[in-house]
Amino acid sequence: LDAAVAYDDSLPGMAGDYLRYNYNRIVRRVYQGENSSGIYYRFVFEISYLSSYEQELAVEEKVQEILSELNIYDSDRETQIRNIYAYVTGNVKYDNMIYETFNVHSAYAAAIEGKAVCQGYSLLLYRLLQEIGIKNRMVPGDAGGVGHVWNIVEMDGRWYNLDATWDWGT
């Protein structure tokens, strides 16, 4: 369990699980060649992300705007978590039919467009909680045989499940 919830307090909100679950695909290639020194290998990694640099700047600005709007910096941890969770579930709609306009798996879709699938919900929730120093992780799994992701959050030494996708609109 300790390894599953390992947490690095020094990471900013855009690192850690946010970075891990914000890539679209990784292509790995290995090339072998030979020169006068002998055989060599060249490893090439191509990483594509769910959002562009410009979109991430917009997400960062929106995260700061949301936290300022919620005015929770002086609140206790439970109130902070509840208010952030209520914001996400009340302002993001589940929509998997909008693939042509933007990537519904991204925090950008959730924060800026207000429509996302579970990954977008979880990425936005992760960013908001992480930004104010609340330990949380993203958990991949499945729901009824379909891929799903949700968050866990640490409070008073215990970890709790948060699934903003299933609570949207509440």
Task: Write out the residue ranges for each language-model feature.
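Hydrophobic/aromatic-rich core segments of domains that either
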Residues: 120-170
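Short, well-ordered strand-loop elements centered on a beta-strand within folded domains, enriched
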Residues: 41-45, 106-109, 113, 158-164
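Alpha-helix capping and helix-loop boundary segments enriched in small/acidic/polar residues
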Residues: 1, 54, 112-116, 140
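Intrinsically disordered, low-complexity repeat and linker tracts
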Residues: 51-60, 118, 166-170
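Intrinsically disordered, low-complexity N-terminal segments that are enriched in acidic
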Residues: 1-42
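Short, structured interface segments
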Residues: 39-53
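Secondary-structure boundary elements
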Residues: 53-110
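Conserved active-site-adjacent core of cysteine acyl-enzyme catalytic domains
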Residues: 99-127
